[in-house]
Amino acid sequence: NNFNVWSIIMSVVSANNNALSAITALPASVSGGGLNLIKTQTISSDTATVSFIHGTSDVVFDSTYKEYVFKYINCHPASDDQKLVFQATTNGSDFNTTVTNTYFYAQHTEADNSNPFAYGADDDQAQGTAFQRLNESTGADADQSISGYLCMFEPSSTTFVKHYLSRSSTIFDQASHVYGAGYFNTTSAITGIQFKFGGASIGSGVIKLYGIS
């Protein structure tokens, strides 16, 4: 409520009985937060899939954190015209969890002859079990790749569906920015996420998993 918010503000201001710039520590009532790196997977040669499964290879993906973030950085496909996709598992091996989502994008071509902002009707799912697309197509030229992030909220919940949101930036002779969001329609705990390109291996790239505290 407003009283609690004001109390926190005043506790910060009076923490050192000085200017805000002089504060070196927060009161106990004010919690911090940050990205806690859990796992980095670096791809340097053609790789079909990249998986993050709880309890495997030092991966934590359980009730330790309420929110997890995957960052995919300069993921480059082994062949042209590819979309990075992902799916979730509840048993550590089958990546086919039912998902409903939304997907829209903005684009601007290098030739400056097209700049659509549109809903991706071919890129969403309604109670589907396929791998979900994260980006508009990226090419296999040496300088082309996809970067972005995927947020998963409380994957360990056995009460609620599992919400996610994503944002991706892609180059394929045009700038593409994709916004995605949806939910995995299961009350079982999600124990892992897998990434791959829809029709090619991942030639190179980095995918990182963080827990949010």
Question: In which residue ranges do the predicted regions lie?
Answer:
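Short, Lys/Arg-enriched N-terminal segments with co-localized hydrophobic residues
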Residues: 1-9
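Surface-exposed molecular-recognition determinants
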Residues: 11-213
